Amino acid sequence: METVRRKLEHIEICLKKEVVSKYRPFDDLILLHRALPEIDESDVCTECTFLNRRLSAPLIISAMTGGHPDAREINANLATAAQETGIAIGVGSQRAALEHPDLEDTFSVVRELAPDVPVIGNIGAVQLHRYGPEVLDRVAEMVDADAVAVHLNFLQESVQPEGERHAAGVLGSLREARFRLPIIIKETGCGIPFEDARMLVDSGIQLIDVAGTGGTSWSMVESYRAELRGDPESKEIGMLFAEWGIPTPVSVIECSRAGAQVISSGGVRSGIDVARSIALGAFMAGAALPLLAPATRGSVDVVRVLQRFVRELRISMFLTGSRSLQELSRAPVIITGRTREILEQRGIDTKIFSSKR
């Protein structure tokens, strides 16, 4: 039951502790304001198609939880809100339900309450490598998924005393997986660089959720878990690596340049961040932590947050003169600060983003 207990601890820590990166890379991005947008706000359309389903906005409720009885209500509230607002939803790692089938309903409730939006299953890359490609079918069937996310969380595993640090052969397992549904490769707070994105694309993976730094730090979460266990060494190591990784905007640009279809997540805290992500080259954006506390209170609170995100995205599109998401993808964005420094060190000319259209 170690996996089950860990899921509950993760939820409690994320609700009660400061687990967010101190650096907010999205603040380095300035969408060019159009004083004369020459469109009406009513002309703006935020709708898109994702996994063959129509959505009200390019937004995903990112993977959060499941695998503990207390998580069922959270997932139920998230799913109800996703259905009401027309937003996609991902579930947390389904490993616990594979080990304890009586917990499957903590995940399957999502499709039950969100029959019309994309649902994304979730399993770790380590589990895929261990159990083989058939595990993808098992997690997909559990939630009647439209796609399955295979998550990479080797920093988190490295900080956990019980972590699994077997990374050798993961790419080969992904390459050999012949699956009927799209596979999304998803990081968990550390981002994905061009080099890895290129290897993934060359292996047949098209969808990458960068989940970069700037949002929830799972190293920090594990540091708090270590403190609860009375493990001072792991606590210190977790805090040391709290800011480790690639900022989300950098990862979005690098993965886009590698030819991937990019989902931007990691520090997405508003509809403006969604707009910034689209302007950088992502086609979807995901958020998790801003929805966790509302989900403990009820679906109505989650709906309010999602509706606010969509309204903020709409205003951002109006003020950049973008009628559609395609036009928003061509909107100039000025890159400043540490994000600009990293991109330039990586050989990317940031001026190409400020002079678009």
Curated annotation (Swiss-Prot):
Keywords: Cytoplasm, Flavoprotein, FMN, Isomerase, Isoprene biosynthesis, Magnesium, Metal-binding, NADP. The keyword Flavoprotein applies. It is found in: Cytoplasm. FMN binds at S62, A63, M64, T65, S93, N122, K186, T216, G267, V268, R269, A288, L289. SMART domains: IMPDH (SM01240). Its EC number is 5.3.3.2. Mg(2+) binds at E157. Its cofactor is FMN; NADPH; Mg(2+). It holds the Pfam family FMN_dh. GO terms for molecular function: FMN binding; isopentenyl-diphosphate delta-isomerase activity; magnesium ion binding; NADPH binding; oxidoreductase activity. Substrate binds at R6, K7, S93, Q94, R95, Q156. One of its GO terms (cellular component) is cytoplasm. It is an enzyme of class 5 (isomerase). CDD domains: IDI-2_FMN. One of its GO terms (biological process) is isoprenoid biosynthetic process. It catalyses: isopentenyl diphosphate = dimethylallyl diphosphate. Involved in the biosynthesis of isoprenoids. Catalyzes the 1,3-allylic rearrangement of the homoallylic substrate isopentenyl (IPP) to its allylic isomer, dimethylallyl diphosphate (DMAPP). Belongs to the IPP isomerase type 2 family. Homooctamer. Dimer of tetramers. This is Isopentenyl-diphosphate delta-isomerase. It comes from Methanothrix thermoacetophila (strain DSM 6194 / JCM 14653 / NBRC 101360 / PT) (Methanosaeta thermophila).
